[in-house]
Design a protein with these regions (language model features):
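Long, structured ligand/cofactor-binding scaffold of large enzymes
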Residues: 1-183
Length: 183
């Protein structure tokens, strides 16, 4: 099956606005922003991770890292890795493990991009239909309740958050912030 899981057929497909087919896909338009205005972007859309210029930081490390040497403090130009991992279908089917392995893919891609990087923190964003956690919310009554094929929105929001943070914590990348959008 050729799913939307990693291929992003929607972003790479034909993009139509008001019945007019656009010359670029949505993904091509997103890439064009970085091409025309790179600002501090060092690398993007390669290795499944982007790198941007970071601040100058103090590093406490061996003077010569190729051999045993004394430690010193020195200023180092840093590079920040930026990564988003979509794991929509796996998280819908099994939220804890789907989001957990999404975090794993994000960590893997950061560590494997360019010369590699050191993941230090993660974020997560969850978007679902109304979770209907309580009765009597008028905004949720606009749409009829439906049967869910895999998990309910409430199950996804709770279990996916637990899975993403569990995996990140085990690999030294705590989940430090996130966002929830229900509609």
């Amino acid at each position: 099956i050729n799913s939307e899981h990693c291929r992003h057929k929607i972003f790479g497909g034909t993009f139509v606005i008001d019945g007019v087919e656009q010359e670029s896909s949505l993904f091509q338009m997103i890439k064009k922003t970085t091409q025309e205005n790179p600002n501090k972007i060092i690398s993007a859309y390669k290795d499944n991770v982007a790198f941007a210029e970071g601040p100058v930081i103090e590093q406490f490390a061996p003077a010569d890292q190729s051999k045993s040497d004394y430690f010193q403090i020195k200023d180092v130009k840093s590079v920040i890795s930026l990564k988003a991992e979509t794991h929509n279908f796996p998280t819908t089917v099994e939220p804890f493990n789907g989001a957990s392995t999404g975090t794993g893919g994000e960590i893997r891609d950061r560590m494997g991009g360019g010369k590699g990087s050191w993941p230090i923190a993660g974020t997560a964003v969850y978007m679902t239909s109304y979770p209907r956690t309580e009765e009597g919310r008028p905004w949720e009554e606009i749409l009829p309740v439906r049967k869910w094929l895999y998990q309910t929105p409430e199950q996804i929001l709770i279990k996916a958050s637990n899975g993403a943070s569990d995996f990140g914590n085990k690999f030294g990348q705590p989940l430090i912030c996130g966002s929830v959008l229900t509609f």
